[in-house]
């Protein structure tokens, strides 16, 4: 989902170049390294993080309470009452991480799980970018309960539950499909602005980030129609809900937009300094949590609408707060960390 060719290849070339195997190889390294650095943030502004004194910390200051090995590239997370589930598209499976034993247990094997995970109506819902369908599974055992012929539009398209339904964007043009959780059938298809992804349910509405339109789109489940649009930061992508608000991570400038879930009005734009592709945002433990490569954990205080802690270093890509801990994937390290983060 968010794997960087430049990161892995650059590391290989660095080792070879340091060994000075040949002038030609050194020149190749320099050319590719420069290209990768130019492309590493994909044309977005440079990540700077937050420079306020006392906010920034090194990831080396955190010691995991548990480390879960997950083969492949662990990515999307979903929380249940006693565990978390994590996808690994490259390994073609979804793994249950038991929050009591701190060990992985059940494994669901399916082709290229992607585009998020949702918990709702007694099930775990898994979009597949391989079989292009929606898989419904038991959240305790991982047993597959149903396969619904609706596929995600994008590997980062997102999925959510609410109003008796599962919602996911199924075409890049874009179309929001509503799947009835009682019948496992599509009961509505809703046209969205092109380039809209990552639905989330909050209040009485479904909210979707319009990545191309720089807006947060509101859908009314009672009518299955778009009923509002709130201008927010550039290239909005990932959403979470908490404290009566929808929080949006804007990839274009690395800010977080806070939108009132009742009125649809923009309440705050918070500088975070983490622009670029990838990343995620979550709410829990009274805080908003964001992650991107290089800045694995950013903590926002919703009472202040500002970043109060930010950790720099290796790790990151998907984040949740659950069972009294921060759960963080290390996409390139084939593991998930369970962390106790100190109070701000």
Predicted regions and their residues:
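Bacterial N-terminal signal peptides
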Residues: 22-33
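Predominantly soluble domains enriched in secretory-pathway, periplasmic, or organellar proteins
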Residues: 36-344
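Mature extracytoplasmic/luminal segments of secretory-pathway proteins
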Residues: 3, 14, 31-33, 111
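Low-complexity intrinsically disordered segments
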Residues: 4, 23-24, 288
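N-terminal secretory signal peptides that target proteins for export/translocation
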Residues: 1-19
């Amino acid at each position: 989902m968010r794997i960087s060719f430049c990161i892995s290849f650059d590391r290989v070339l660095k080792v070879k170049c340091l060994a000075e195997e040949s002038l030609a190889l050194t020149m190749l390294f320099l050319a590719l390294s420069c290209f990768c650095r130019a492309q590493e943030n994909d044309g977005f502004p440079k990540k700077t993080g937050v420079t306020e004194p006392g906010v920034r910390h090194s990831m080396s200051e955190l010691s995991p309470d548990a480390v879960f090995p997950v083969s492949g590239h662990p990515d999307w997370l979903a929380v249940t009452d006693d565990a978390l589930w994590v996808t690994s598209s490259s390994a073609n499976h979804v793994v249950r991480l038991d929050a009591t034993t701190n060990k992985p247990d059940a494994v669901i094997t399916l082709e290229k799980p992607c585009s998020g995970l949702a918990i709702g109506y007694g099930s775990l819902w898994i979009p597949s970018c391989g079989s292009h369908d929606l898989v419904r599974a038991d959240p305790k055992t991982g047993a597959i309960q149903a396969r619904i012929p609706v596929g995600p539009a994008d590997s980062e398209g997102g999925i959510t539950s609410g109003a008796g339904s599962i919602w996911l964007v199924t075409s890049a043009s874009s179309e929001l499909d509503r799947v009835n959780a009682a019948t496992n059938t599509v009961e509505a298809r809703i046209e969205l602005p092109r380039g809209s992804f990552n639905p989330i349910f909050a209040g009485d509405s479904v909210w979707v980030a319009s990545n191309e339109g720089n807006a947060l789109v509101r859908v009314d489940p009672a009518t299955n129609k778009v009923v509002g649009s709130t201008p927010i930061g550039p290239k909005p992508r990932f959403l979470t809900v908490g404290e009566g608000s929808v929080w949006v991570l804007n990839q274009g400038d690395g800010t977080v937009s806070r939108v009132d879930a009742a009125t649809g009005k923009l309440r705050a734009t918070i500088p975070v300094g983490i622009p670029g592709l990838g990343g995620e945002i979550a709410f829990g433990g009274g805080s908003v949590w964001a992650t991107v490569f290089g800045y694995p954990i950013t903590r926002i205080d919703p009472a202040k609408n500002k970043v109060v802690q930010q950790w720099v270093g290796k790790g990151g890509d998907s984040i949740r707060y659950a069972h009294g801990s921060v759960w963080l994937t290390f996409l390139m390290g084939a593991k998930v960390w369970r962390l106790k983060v100190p109070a701000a």
